[in-house]
Amino acid sequence: MVDYYEVLGVQRHASPEDIKKAYRKQALKWHPDKNPENKEEAERKFKQVAEAYEVLSDAKKRDIYDKYGKEGLNGGGGGGGIHFDSPFEFGFTFRNPDDVFREFFGGRDPFSFDFFEDPFDDFFGNRRGPRGNRSRGAGSFFSTFSGFPSFGSGFPAFDTGFTPFGSLGHGGLTSFSSTSFGGSGMGNFKSISTSTKIVNGKKITTKRIVENGQERVEVEEDGQLKSLTINGVADENALAEECQRRGQPTPALAPGPAPAPVRVPSQARPLAPTPAPTPAPTPAPAPAQTPAPSVSTRPQKPPRPAPTAKLGSKSNWEDDEQDRQRVPGNWDAPMTSAGLKEGGKRKKQKQKEDLKKKKSTKGNH
């Protein structure tokens, strides 16, 4: 007998959030489009995963399953479901696994890169029709879903189960289609998805083309191409080429906001640029100075005046001349001590004679 907890790979006390995470992982793993080489086994596993999620994601169904097993739900596995006596008076019919898959993913196509865009971009309106034909090899795009975050945590709409978006009062989405094809690997993968909305009476069609890792998004308004982006960046050249190919005029790009004028006071004058500071030259080392000789602060004596020659008698002058000791000059011949004594005696004798003559002269007068 199949154990739904084992099918999803969870424990019996797993939380509703764990159930959702497990279904997402197992449904993407065993989807028949991902396993074309083992399609029969994949279809069987995919159906079991859908049944397990239908039962364990509902509190009442899970309680009945825990008490009575699968027999308590369908009375022997006929697939048609029966009513039976239970505290819930519950009858159950398993749905098509593809319907469960589409309902879980909110009507979006997980086979295209469009699935990773804004989760509410194309949700509003009716549910899309049956899945388009898909043909994938072993290297399908599904391998990229292994690290995708939980839908329960990322998209609030999945927390309470699927709600038809038409009931939300948004009738903008009128159609949705998707076509994916490729070879044996990701190198030849191509996905094309188209969505149409009616916004303010205008028909807005968004076409996404993903090929070899490059995404091209074209937006039309009433059949007129309005914008074209490649990998999220607007490409004006590609837009012009596509419009020319379609025979349509190129839409004018919206001008950007004009810069606000800067008001300058009339008295204000532009400041002169401040010159760059010139580095000061490095001063040369001062030469060592010899200390000046100390100058005495004592006042110098004035020079002695030259002696004034006294005019007197000849005798006085001669006496002074005789009394003054004569200093020999360089021209004087050297004199011996005997010569000096002799000269002195002669002078004294002459002086005595002169005195006698003076006295005699005075006596005659």
Swiss-Prot record:
Residues 252-262, 272-290 have a biased composition (Pro residues). It is found in: Cytoplasm, Perinuclear region; Nucleus; Cytoplasm, Myofibril, Sarcomere, Z line. GO terms for molecular function: ATPase activator activity; DNA binding; Hsp70 protein binding; protein folding chaperone; unfolded protein binding. GO terms for cellular component: cytoplasm; cytosol; nucleoplasm; nucleus; perinuclear region of cytoplasm; Z disc. Keywords: Chaperone, Cytoplasm, Methylation, Nucleus. Its main location: cytoplasm. Has a stimulatory effect on the ATPase activity of HSP70 in a dose-dependent and time-dependent manner and hence acts as a co-chaperone of HSP70. Plays an indispensable role in the organization of KRT8/KRT18 filaments. Acts as an endogenous molecular chaperone for neuronal proteins including huntingtin. Suppresses aggregation and toxicity of polyglutamine-containing, aggregation-prone proteins. Also reduces cellular toxicity and caspase-3 activity. The modification Omega-N-methylarginine is found at R136. Residues 120-243 are annotated as: Interaction with KRT18. It comes from Mus musculus. PROSITE patterns: DNAJ_1, DNAJ_2. Residues 2-147 are annotated as: Interaction with HSP70. This is DnaJ homolog subfamily B member 6. GO terms for biological process: actin cytoskeleton organization; chaperone-mediated protein folding; chorio-allantoic fusion; chorion development; extracellular matrix organization; intermediate filament organization; negative regulation of DNA-templated transcription; negative regulation of inclusion body assembly. Homooligomer. Interacts with BAG3, HSPB8 and STUB1. Interacts with ALKBH1. Interacts with HSP70, KRT18 and PTTG. Interacts with Slfn1; promoting nuclear translocation of Slfn1. Residues 3-69 form the J domain. Residues 243-365 are annotated as: Disordered.
